Regions:
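Gly/Trp-centered helix-boundary motif
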Residues: 1-68, 73, 80, 94, ...
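Short, functional N-terminal and low-complexity linear motifs
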Residues: 8-11, 53-57, 109, 122-124, ...
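Residue-level detector of alpha-helical transmembrane segments in integral membrane proteins
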Residues: 12-13, 89, 128, 167
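Generic hydrophobic transmembrane alpha-helix motif, especially the helices
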Residues: 31, 41, 62, 66-67, ...
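Amphipathic cytosolic juxtamembrane alpha-helices at the membrane-cytosol interface
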Residues: 39-54, 58, 78-86, 146-150, ...
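Interfacial helix-capping/hinge residues at the ends of transmembrane alpha-helices
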Residues: 71, 101, 154-155
Length: 174
């Protein structure tokens, strides 16, 4: 936050509990007011939301890549692989997401030392959320793959010898 005039870690007890700027007692420089230690509330919210947005977007991208990859390959190849992936997906969908995230975090705490876990907490959180949310993406992408793989342009690509990877990612996925 290079353009933030208010450092969230600095205190100003003289500005403690300043009301928002739209009230009569409020100051224009503190749009949402200040907390008990004089920190600007808007700056604190923006500073905190940065981490939340990074974790949220990263977890969704991780779940999307994992779920679409597994769903696309399961729908395209079919057979026992599809059955295995979709049964695993069904089992994971029965476990609540928060419980799965706690399980992943607990396993990470058991594997990684405490100091290392403190440094990697955001990455563990992204992984835990992504692992608990990928089945929704897998089901949707598998269903779309089953619809698309029987169309003429996919059959034509198979006949002329295009590889399965190219068919999946250039013809079916888009």
């Amino acid at each position: 936050t290079p353009y933030n005039p208010f450092d969230p870690s600095s205190l100003s007890l003289m500005d403690a509990f300043t009301p928002p700027s739209w009230t009569d007692e409020g100051l224009a420089k503190f749009i949402l007011g200040t907390d008990g230690q004089g920190r600007d509330m808007l700056a604190t919210i923006l500073y905190g939301s940065r981490i939340s947005l990074i974790v949220g977007f990263s977890a969704v991208i991780f779940a999307l890549v994992l779920g679409v990859g597994l769903g696309l390959s399961a729908g395209y190849f079919g057979g026992k692989y599809e059955m295995l992936v979709m049964r695993f997906t069904d089992v994971q969908l029965t476990v609540p997401s928060i419980l799965m995230a706690l399980l992943v975090d607990g396993i990470a705490r058991g594997i990684i030392s405490r100091e290392m876990h403190d440094e990697m907490a955001i990455y563990v959180l992204i992984f835990a959320i992504g692992i608990s949310e990928w089945p929704q993406f897998a089901r949707v992408s598998r269903a779309a793959t089953l619809v698309e793989k029987n169309k003429d342009y996919v059959s034509a690509s198979t006949i002329i010898g295009v590889s399965n990877i190219i068919i999946m990612f250039k013809h079916i996925l888009p």
